[in-house]
Amino acid sequence: MQEPVSPIQITLPVRQLVEFLRRAGSIDNRFTGFDRANEGARIHRKLQRAAVKEHADYAAEVFLRGIFAYEEIEFTLEGRADGIFTAADGVTVVDEIKTTACPAADITPDFAPEHWAQAIVYAAIYAAQHELEEMRVQLTYFQVDEELILRFERHYTAQQLQEEVEALLAEYAPWARRAVEWKKARNSDLQAMQFPFPAYRPGQRAMAGEVYKVCRDGGRLLCQAPTGIGKSMSVLFPALKSMGNESVGPIFYLTARGTTRTAAENALAILRDTEPELHLRSVTLTAKDKICLCETRECTPEACPYANGYYARIKGALWDVLDVPCLTAETLQEYAERHTVCPFELGLDSSLWSDVIIGDYNYLFDPVVHLVRFFESVGDYIFLVDEAHNLPGRAREMHSAALTKTSFYEAKKLLGKGKSSLKNALTKVNDVFIEWRHRAEEETAARDGRFGKTFFLKERSEEFDHLLNRLCEPLKAWLDDHREPDETHTALLQLYFDVRAWLRVADTFDDHFVLQITASGSEVRAAQLCLDPSAFLADSFALGRAAVLFSATLAPASYYKDLCGVPEARAVALRSPFPAGNQGLFCIGNVSTRYKDRDASLAIVEESLATMVRARCGNYLAFFPSYAYMEQAYAQFKEHCPEINCIKQENAMDEQQKAAFLAQFVPGPRHPLLGFAVMGGVFGEGVDLTGDRLIGVGIVGPGLPQVGPRQEQLRDYFEQTRGSGFDYAYRYPGMNKVLQAAGRVIRTPRDKGVVLLIDNRFAMPDYRRLMPPHWSHLKMIYDTEELERELWRFWEE
């Protein structure tokens, strides 16, 4: 007797199903997409409150889950209906609310088939659960600029609703079969997958074990893993094993820079090379500007053939790319050209079918551009956060916003002569900036003025935000009427986005923020500054099952657990896998590089660096806390040490200039080279100069951020909230830069090199306690002759 075939079981969000099958038309980013989730949620709540007054039994955000069978597939469909109520004639109504910036004239009953489909599925689930013979489906559209409400209704029997859902499932069935077959093969392969190297590196097995446990059990892990452990493989391999065993995922590998995305891609490539039949899909999400196929990026159907008719062609393109296990930027561009679809959107759409998604922090943490398709609700996601020491700073930026007086004044000038509601609205905003400039000048006159003309407010400016809200309608109307991309359109469109960004931050403004007003000449700059992003980060991490935050520098763990929003995380710190004797570690203890001592320090700094370089011919880097200090030291060093080739980091270097700088660090140099750079800059982390391409670094000072009004606000805030203002605002961020800079030397077990710390503060307990265990052999030096002897001894050993 033949064994019965077990049904294929698949769970799908209703919205994902209907948008995939029924969305039509083109990509048009003129106004769609910007903060739609937040703005839509606000409008939803407003309309739901109004509906409750009209219908006493109106229930908002009703969670629905229904099981539907189609052939051998059992679908579980789930989602939240915006509203369900009983109409005056006794018929139950499902209300689906949508916000749109499209002109009201375009909003017809046939405006968006996917909206009807979504409401129909909800109605079918509700009718089946409550044994109703009929239901009504209502679409409620809110046109955001005119604040106009339009409603459309359709009546269905329970049988008709069931047939509509079955038609959707019949269309989706081939995709469901493919997804389930892939997942089954993937899990089997991952369970059998072996570690791709003959042996683990020192510390690597311990790290992988910690990562596996947190992925299996759920929770948060903070892992300090020094250079050489192989961090990318140490997190990806156990996360993938957990995916195979627990059937969780997808895995999000989140990075601060493109170079670390490459490290993740390389680790996956090694796994695929070791297991050629491995079923594993990955996609690398690349910024729109970098992956766009057009010379000028304008995402409208009129300007871009890849945007025009995108939704008619995307399913064919997706079916094709599902055969490709590794979707990089280049691969996405290739398939996008083949199918005439946008490569950026193709990457986003393919992410729903991927096992590993590699991308920037902002795809999870940025409230504007995070992946709504995943993060509207909680999932079994695994978040791997590389270079996590960068996360608090990046998160502060994501939750801050700034506007300048000039942008409003110039916009008004570009509009030319004559009166209009838009020019009037711009004038009113400009007037507030003028008032702020007067206040900044008055307050500065009453203080010492060492930080310039600036002042802070602990609360948002309700008046200013109200004027910006009033500005949006005429500004949006002007943009609707003037779509040619000339200078005026470009400036006003950017202003529109900047205003919307400001208002989004204003909606979250609380005691974690300050408002800073700064005047300089006729310019005035207003900035809403997020001082503490930990609550926002905690909310983001709560969307997933597990999170691993890892970096070579996460000390002290308590600080990073706090600011990264993972106070309950398990923290582990692994020892360096390299022999301690390969690194000469010295501290020049007879000099202060504090700001007030900078001029006096230059001679000893120069002597120390020159002694380091002369001890052995090779390539070296010297890191300074600021450009100004670096320029001073560079000029003096070149004058006094002409036999040593010197280069320096320039401000705002492009990729070509950075590459040219690093290209001078050649293996086996015949003449010494000393590069001058800034701590925390482009050469202070993420630079991998192996072997003898770099044999020493000099680090001038403990890297404390420059004292300024913002940094002092951070200090005051963390003193009040944590009792550790100086540590949080200055000492911890500074020492992280020091440790990152020191990590540029000794990149492999065979490397040998010197780290020279130049400042007497490095000897103090408050700084020593932040140094890693493998720095226990730090030797204090108090004169040049002693340094010469110690360097000679180190290189001779």
Question: Model-derived features: where do they sit?
Answer:
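Metal-dependent nuclease catalytic cores that hydrolyze phosphodiester bonds in DNA/RNA
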Residues: 1-87
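Mg2+/Mn2+-dependent nuclease catalytic core
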Residues: 66-163
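Conserved pre-motif I regulatory segment
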Residues: 182-224
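A substrate-engagement module of RecA-like helicase motors
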Residues: 187-188, 194, 247-357, 365, ...
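Walker A/P-loop
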Residues: 216-238
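A contiguous, basic/glycine-rich beta-loop/short-helix subdomain that forms a polymer-engagement track
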Residues: 332-357, 368-374, 477-592, 600-604, ...
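Conserved RecA-like P-loop NTPase helicase motor core
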Residues: 589-600, 651-762
